[in-house]
């Protein structure tokens, strides 16, 4: 089964709890997570974290998107053209973003790329590979030591990140 490719918008990076899940999904080969170097420059507070994950797999950072950016004028915000350009170069299936309004469906449909809220994206991955996502969540929780966290605490925090459906579905699966 081919992994979907998901380009992460810059607004996903500051949320390290979400990013931890997405990177671990990638490590478990459930999804191929990518980003562009330009996105690294957006929120300064993520630099240390990005430095640690850059070495993980150099193919996660997409290069060579710059020439395409100038050809893309479909998006409402010109500052988001680089995101679409990088997604095209990566042959991404998804742009994972909290700002869906910046990536209108009618503008992306010609490229076969879907802008998707992180909650919906995680639910799709859960549908695609339930056991794999549960393993990822177990790994994420067991790796959190400072402070240690229970699955219940993790799920409660995911709700604060507007990952309500994903959190509810996980809670249901863990109660079975």
Protein language model regions, located:
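Metal-dependent nucleic-acid phosphoesterase active-site entry motif
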Residues: 1-20
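Short active-site oxyanion
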Residues: 4, 30-32, 91-94
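PIN/NYN-family metal-dependent endoribonuclease catalytic core
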Residues: 16-44
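A generic structural signal for alpha->beta connector loops
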Residues: 30, 58-59, 112
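PIN-domain endoribonuclease scaffold, especially VapC-family toxins
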Residues: 34, 38-66, 140-162
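Active-site neighborhoods of divalent-metal-dependent phosphate/nucleic-acid chemistry enzymes
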Residues: 58-94, 128-129, 148, 159-176
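Acidic, metal-binding active-site segment of PIN/NYN-like and related structure-specific nucleases
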Residues: 83-113
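Acidic, PIN/NYN-like endoribonuclease modules and their adjacent C-terminal/linker elements
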Residues: 101-176
């Amino acid at each position: 089964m081919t992994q979907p490719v998901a380009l992460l918008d810059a607004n996903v990076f500051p949320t390290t709890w979400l990013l931890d899940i997405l990177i671990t999904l990638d490590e478990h080969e459930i999804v191929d997570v990518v980003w562009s170097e330009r996105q690294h420059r957006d929120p300064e507070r993520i630099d240390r974290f990005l430095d640690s994950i850059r070495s993980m797999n150099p193919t996660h950072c997409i290069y060579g998107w710059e020439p395409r950016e100038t050809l893309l004028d479909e998006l409402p915000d010109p500052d988001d053209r680089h995101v679409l350009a990088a997604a095209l170069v990566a042959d991404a299936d998804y742009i994972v973003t909290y700002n869906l309004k910046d990536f209108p469906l009618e503008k992306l449909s010609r490229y076969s790329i879907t802008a998707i809220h992180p909650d919906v994206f995680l639910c799709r991955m859960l549908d695609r590979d339930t056991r794999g996502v549960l393993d990822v969540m177990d790994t994420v929780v067991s790796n959190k030591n400072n402070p240690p966290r229970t699955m219940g605490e993790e799920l409660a925090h995911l709700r604060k990140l507007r990952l309500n459906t994903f959190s509810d579905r996980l809670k249901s699966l863990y109660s079975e």
